[in-house]
């Protein structure tokens, strides 16, 4: 079966086409700046990569271009060769406990959740509808970033705000990066040969979050009602005193929406360092002795360590700490700065093993009382696996 995994933004569309259940990558690509006359379309096929700039007015045109290119490049013979498409959808609220086949009813449910994720769900829906318009008979599945966290107990997900906020508006912790956490959890269960493994997973890219996992289930996570909660990230502040919003509104004569935008897009590593939201740039500046870059980095690391310590207590000990995603997989310095702060819990780093980049490896020493791993995530493959599972369930 050929299954496509799609991750759609407001002006972008990232995709992979995989052969399932063999899990072989056939091709991948990225369409950026949708809605402009200088959009870019990049297609990678085995060792061959093509890129072109052209006008792409909307997502429907982007999807048409993508599917036509697959035929033109002889990746597929006809559109019907694609058996299913899986869409990453950021917010599933409490309505979705699993990935789901997409029909009018399910799409309407996703639309009803747009006020919970106004930056993400509308873009996801545009992509779903574009595929429907171009290829109406295509089997489509929604895979949600929040689903994995639906196992979090109420005492861990509910805020101590007026209970009516939850009853009326479903204000609660939802958590994100769930597709990644699902994949890493399954990888670690196999690696440790232990279904009831207790894990703390640190997903560290431009967005950063942590998750406490017990026996394959999320029991707590650092992101909350939105991805803004938790640790400082590339441009997000992470946790702050909510009273700061009113204070800044009065001092700067700003509205709530503008301040929220500042917290989402102008804070975190970028806000404190005043240099960049990219951790690679921050690490390069630290090597040059830049104190502001060091401060931004130290604040982030401190908060990550706080969550790890908290989840260690919550889980009553762990089988493994796992680093994944861009920085988690590729920065030995990032990992070492965290591990050395966890020596009180019995973590001992193996400096040589920690030099690993982008492949599965244990990074703690043989005399370490705790194990830490690097495990590359693969959200696209996880989505494809969900599509295959739902396809078999629906089509049997």
Swiss-Prot record:
What Pfam families does this protein map onto? Acetate_kinase
Entry cofactor note text?
Answer: Mg(2+). Can also accept Mn(2+).
One MF term in GO for this entry? acetate kinase activity
Q: Which UniProt keywords apply?
A: ATP-binding, Cytoplasm, Kinase, Magnesium, Metal-binding, Nucleotide-binding, Transferase
Where does the UniProt annotation locate this protein?
Cytoplasm
Q: Where does Mg(2+) bind?
A: 7, 379
Q: What is its main location?
A: cytoplasm
GO terms under cellular component: cytoplasm
- Provide the binding site for ATP: 14, 203-207, 278-280, 326-330
Check the record and name the Gene3D superfamilies matching this protein. Answer: 3.30.420.40
User: Which residues are recorded as binding substrate?
Assistant: 88
What catalytic activity does the UniProt entry give for this protein?
acetate + ATP = acetyl phosphate + ADP
Q: Which InterPro entries match?
A: Ac/propionate_kinase, Aliphatic_acid_kin_short-chain, Aliphatic_acid_kinase_CS, ATPase_NBD
Instruction: Cite the annotated pathway.
Output: Metabolic intermediate biosynthesis; acetyl-CoA biosynthesis; acetyl-CoA from acetate: step 1/2
- From what superkingdom does this record's organism come? Bacteria
Known EC number: 2.7.2.1
Please name the HAMAP family in this protein's record.
Acetate_kinase
Q: Which PANTHER family match?
A: ACETATE KINASE, ACETATE KINASE-RELATED
Please describe what this protein does: Catalyzes the formation of acetyl phosphate from acetate and ATP. Can also catalyze the reverse reaction.
Q: Which family does it belong to?
A: Belongs to the acetokinase family.
NCBIfam families from the entry? ackA
Q: How does it assemble?
A: Homodimer.
Supply the name of the protein. Acetate kinase
Q: Which species is the source of this protein?
A: Phytoplasma australiense
The coding gene here is ackA
